[in-house]
């Protein structure tokens, strides 16, 4: 018996008496197809389905009809070409992101990145970026949280796709107030000039990665900054997308979450 077979048998014996637990709810994973999450938690993730806007992934309230560009993207086209999301910012996915982002449950980076990778493959199967770039935190916020959740997801995507991740390309050059509770215009004013690039680009395709997209203001500002320094096509990948009709409740929740981490 070789070493790999022996390890497999030992692991199987351990699993028999100590079944692997779900990283999110800690229940036995059972026959789940995911190596980290149980079937119950996987079933609680609400996928982003048609109809939605292919540019910003905004879900539409109507059931019928296909995907089409939303009114905001028609009137003010963003500097990114498309957006993909692992699911809606509701129920289990919302809880998972909260655990990952605010409770320090960093082991969720890989299962969440797998979900996002699957969504990316579905949205843009033939699109490969030259660089994966996470939305940065301001150094002050980074010192409070000690990690950038967008960077952790970006690294997992880069590892699985063999694509370089550049965490120093896009930086936040000034602190901003919390976005929660701000109107779209206030959000834009709050973030305008907050991001800069550390070097020029030469037409590289960029995948911009963030955790949650609410109004899309952050992605718009970042993509504009990337294009301003010579980036080629920019795509956006987020763990979750908020519904427009749920933004009011989302703002209230995010306000509380921001207070929990000290503003």
Go through each PLM region and give its residues:
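Glycine-rich phosphate/pyrophosphate-handling loop used in enzymes and phosphotransfer proteins
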Residues: 1-209, 214-263
């Amino acid at each position: 018996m070789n070493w790999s077979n022996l390890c497999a048998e030992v692991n199987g014996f351990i699993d028999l008496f100590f079944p692997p637990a779900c990283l999110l709810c800690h229940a036995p994973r059972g026959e789940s197809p995911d190596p980290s999450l149980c079937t119950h938690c996987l079933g609680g993730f609400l996928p982003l389905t048609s109809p939605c806007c292919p540019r910003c992934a905004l879900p539409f309230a109507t059931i019928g009809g296909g995907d089409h560009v939303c009114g905001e993207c028609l009137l003010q086209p963003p500097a990114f070409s498309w957006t993909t999301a692992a699911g809606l910012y509701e129920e289990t996915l919302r809880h998972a992101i909260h655990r990952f982002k605010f409770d320090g449950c960093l082991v969720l980076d890989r299962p969440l990145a797998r979900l996002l990778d699957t969504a990316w493959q579905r949205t843009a199967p033939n699109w490969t970026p030259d660089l994966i770039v996470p939305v940065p935190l301001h150094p002050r916020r980074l010192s409070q949280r000690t990690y950038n959740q967008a960077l952790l997801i970006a690294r997992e995507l880069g590892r699985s796709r063999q694509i370089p991740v550049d965490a120093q390309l896009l930086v936040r050059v000034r602190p901003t107030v919390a976005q929660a509770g701000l109107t779209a215009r206030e959000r834009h004013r709050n973030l305008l000039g907050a991001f800069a690039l550390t070097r020029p680009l030469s037409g590289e395709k960029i995948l911009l990665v963030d955790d949650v997209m609410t109004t899309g203001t952050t992605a718009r500002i970042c993509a504009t900054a990337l294009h301003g320094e010579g980036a080629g096509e920019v795509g956006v990948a987020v763990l979750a997308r908020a519904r427009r009709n749920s933004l009011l409740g989302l703002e209230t929740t995010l306000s509380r979450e921001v207070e929990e981490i000290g503003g």
